[in-house]
């Protein structure tokens, strides 16, 4: 299965889904790499959102076995919104063996 987010300021992430503190750690980490208030050349005021989405990526390939996603015990699939809230779309394509 292929999941694609056709937006340049949102991303698809596979990561731990148990400890909510990890979400805050991700936010802190990405904000250090691409702070919102930096003087960027991009004129729309959301360059940090584009950079964060590019770092994480807009697509992930996942396996399905017996009708279920194959993920680690603590893994989850997340849509990361960096320029919202706004309406987003995630496309899913299931490819046979």
Question: What positions do the PLM features span?
Answer:
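Active-site histidine-anchored catalytic micro-motif
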Residues: 1-97
């Amino acid at each position: 299965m292929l999941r694609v987010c056709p937006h340049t300021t949102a991303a698809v992430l596979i990561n731990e889904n148990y400890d909510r503190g990890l979400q805050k750690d991700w936010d802190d980490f990405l904000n250090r790499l691409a702070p919102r208030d930096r003087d960027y050349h991009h004129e729309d005021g959301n360059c940090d959102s584009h950079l964060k989405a590019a770092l994480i990526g807009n697509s992930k390939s996942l396996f399905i076995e017996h009708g279920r996603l194959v993920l680690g015990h603590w893994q989850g699939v997340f849509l990361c919104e960096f320029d919202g809230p706004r309406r987003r779309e995630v496309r899913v394509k299931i490819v046979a063996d």
